[in-house]
Regions:
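Small-residue (G/A/S/T)-rich helix-start motifs and N-terminal tracts that mark the onset
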Residues: 1-81
């Protein structure tokens, strides 16, 4: 059995919050997915006010905005994983 060859990396749809310190959330998901050989498609769900020790605030994004962004990506890309 031969391994399948992909000319483009598989797309992973990620729903996550934004961590401005880079230790978690979308900012950490993107390089982890890239390191595994996939392409990250990010849908932010929340904005946080935090540093590398404490979370001071979490602001959830409007669910309709999250849904709309996800649908745009689903319509355009072949999603391999969520």
């Amino acid at each position: 059995m031969q391994a399948a060859y992909r000319s483009t990396p598989p797309c992973v749809l990620v729903f996550s919050g934004s961590d401005p310190s880079g230790g978690a959330g979308m900012q950490a998901d993107i390089p982890a997915i890239t390191a595994l050989g996939a392409h990250s498609l990010s849908v932010p769900t929340a904005l946080t006010v935090q540093d590398n020790v404490s979370v001071f605030a979490v602001h959830a994004l409007d669910p309709e905005l999250v849904r709309h962004q996800a649908q745009v990506l689903i319509d355009r890309f072949d999603i391999a994983a969520v």
